[in-house]
Amino acid sequence: MRMLMRVKWLKAFLVATTAIMPLVAIGEGYAVAQTAQNRVPYHIPAQSLASSLSAFARASNYKIAYATSLTLGKMAPAIEGNYTAEDVLERLLSGSGLSYRFTGEKSVSIAAIGQQDAAFQAEGTTLLDTITVTGGQGIAAADAPYSTAAPTAYISEQTIERFRGSSPADIFRGTAGVMSAEARNGAGSIDVNIRGMQGMGRVKTTIDGAENAINIYQGYQGISNRTFVDPDLLAGVEIQKGSDAASSGIAGTVAMRTVEAGDIVKEGNRFGIRVKGGFGTNSSKPVGDTVAGYQVINKGYAGPKIDDPELPDYDSLFVPSVTSGEGTMNRPAFLQPTNGSGSIVAAMKDEQVELLAGYAYRKRGNYHAGKHGSAAQVNDRGPTSVCNTLSCQLNPDDPYNWMWYPQYMEHSGLTNYRAGEQVLNTQLETGSWLLKGKLKFGDGHSIQLGYTGFKSISGDRMASNLNGLGAQARQQSKTTDADIHTGTFKYRWNPEDNDVINLKSNLWVTRLEQRSPPAYGGSANAPSGFKSGPDLLTWGADISNESHFSTAYGDLDLTYGASYKLEDTAPSEGTRKWDTWLDLRDGKREEAAGYIKAGYKPVDWLTLNGGLRYSHMWSQDRSDPTVKLPELDYSTAAFREGGFSPSFGVTVEPIKGTQFYANYSSTLRAPSIMESVTAFSMNVNADTKSERSNNWELGVNLIEDNLFAGSDQTMVKLGYFNWDVQNYIAREWYRDPNKIYPGMRIINIDRARFSGLELSTRYELGGFSAELAANYYLNVEFCRTADSCEDKSLYADYSTNAVPPKYGIDLTLSQKLLEDALTLGGRISHVSSRAIGHGGATAQGMSQFIRLIEWEPYTLVDIFAEYKINDNYTASVRVENLTDQYYVDPLSLVQQPGPGRTFYASLTASF
């Protein structure tokens, strides 16, 4: 048993939480009389019955179970003063037609009068339908970050539903310090950036414990790191910022959980089904070879203006031309449905078996940009000289290296898309499958098999083909296809009344294929409809156990385990033969690790943490040097590297609801498969070393009830981070004097540094809720050498477009009305300019090989309304980008705008 004082402290934190979870069993025969007679101060205003019961649970530390439908449309009177639990329940339920029953020392159930006895079988299993459990002995997942001594965050299913955006990447908006890159050209994928670090395995992203990540070559613009999922099948997203001994993610871990049988089957039922359907607006059907934006052709000649009397009309021969795309400005009406989605999930659940099957489908055409902002324009600069050649950049003092234009037309704006214009190649069609089966044995044993499938058809194009303000976008006739299949096996052993065994083991495999049309046409002899791309096979396994020991000298918690992962990537059949220039990576990478974490609590207010991880990586390059250019270094390379990653921390809890923590870690990341295997124009560097990130995390958590008003709840999480990444792995442009062709290679720079502040808060009063998330970067810098640190990203490096905004602020508000049946809300998001500058290409004497994607500060407003028609049906509407802003997303590889104002409506049925 845990020490009594520890239990008291845990209860103090749990008072301030509201947990919504299935109630599996409630026993009878508890000694509850004395507990029920204890007097507690209450400050509960007159409000809906559901809100009053939540306030009662927080103040009394009771867990209340009831059917959601029982409280719809019911109000409760104000409660002010010191009362027993019985007194409060009597007053709240007076005249409601409901009664209560104590089912444990700190638990109570509510049912219709006369139905309490029928609600329980002899063995105490509840038969109520949709159960809401409020307060008591569990912390809701959305509340957990506010009592976790680490920089964590959680995105709930409710938040995903309300603010899902036009791409899965949009679900991370509103999370301090976290964004997803390539939101508009990512083929419906997720590429998570945590505090300025992303890609190459720096952020470990899983779905039900399995990875389906793939790296996509984007020409000179770098790579995309893609994970695929449909938001309709997600039940929540847990985020750990920074390293953890149990994870390979040096910058953090994103663990997405898909729906389980318990999320679908209502309490007391054996079967359940959930059906969703909806539509959206602001999109148009793609038409092949359509062009958008402006095409400007300026005509001039080298050298200064010719002023010769014998050629008086010479300049009149150089008249520029300006044309614009046709058929892309016909934006549909605001409420005209132009895209749709639907999903169905069915499940069965009993004491031994859980089964679930789900399918989700969505289809959208090309979205339209907003109208208010820096859209494309063409300005007449008149007669002018322009330095737009390499010769001029190298020798600007020679006037004959300049170009003279009698009339020069210049693009302006953020992109080459006009206000409200159709953004080409942004269409997306996806289908997702989900299967799960779980078998529970005696003594806490269980096994679970799972399968997820995902297929997408998108207008995704190679990013290097879409850049340049003067480039006119063209709708490609061929699409990019992704096909992912993942299988999982999970074993759990968690016997009751055993604090030493909580065993978890997982085995998973993912097969991922992506096919794209040849970027530059490919071979003329290629088969009709030929597409090329990478094939990736990934295996993973892990095992861990948690043990708790109570001693006379304090409590000790241990977590220990091991993991293994194999990645094997190769070009698809025909890629080297028909996609004449593209040489994709061909190799494999393995990584094994073991770890142990310990938490020691000598007294109630102090916790000491420590951890140690050892990891080892092997990689093998299978590239064939005879296939492409023998002048380049395609030599087969093998990497082998490993090391230890220690961590420690301290947590102090001086008073109820207040927690201070300080954590330090020194974590190793070996080169990823992208960094250790050769590809087109990118050479392996045998001298590449592992990154080591030395991270400091300082933070405070506050949870307080009745701070500003009776029965309110306030939660605050404030943190400071300082990351120093030694031997940061980057990419550079270089020319080997022994080779004919220049190229790019992976290198280690001295270090990269990231530091900043993060704030997350939530305030609840009755049916009102306000959440604020903000982050501010104090420092971002890259140091090529120890004495050459700059607050600029490096020329030709992948990090060019991974630098986040200087700061971001998100405010989310919601209010329940009509006895909690109606919820109105919205979110205001402000994104600042880029945190730092960018190193110039001229410093290298070469052209720009990664174009910096620029954006301007912008503010987006999203609103929503949800109406619970009854216990089975919920209708929702939402408007995203309410003010129709024209903006460019940060962390993109292409210079194109995000979606303009879009209306969505949906209906969810649950039985």
Model-predicted segments: where are they?
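Short, acidic, small-residue-rich periplasmic hinge/interaction motif at the N-terminus
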Residues: 53, 59, 113-161, 169, ...
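Membrane-embedded beta-barrel scaffold of Gram-negative outer-membrane proteins
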Residues: 493, 502-518, 653-655, 659-665, ...
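Transmembrane beta-barrel wall of Gram-negative outer-membrane proteins
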Residues: 288, 294, 298-457
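Structural signature of Gram-negative outer-membrane beta-barrels, strongest in the C-terminal barrel
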Residues: 440-442, 555-559, 563-565, 582-723, ...
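Face-selective signature of the C-terminal outer-membrane beta-barrel domain
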Residues: 440-454, 482-628, 715-717, 761-764, ...
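Extracytoplasmic beta-strand/coil segments of soluble accessory domains associated
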Residues: 108-111, 144, 169-214, 235, ...
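A beta-strand signature from Gram-negative outer-membrane beta-barrel systems
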Residues: 227-276, 910
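Gram-negative outer-membrane beta-barrel transporters
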Residues: 603-608, 616-617, 708-725, 742-840, ...
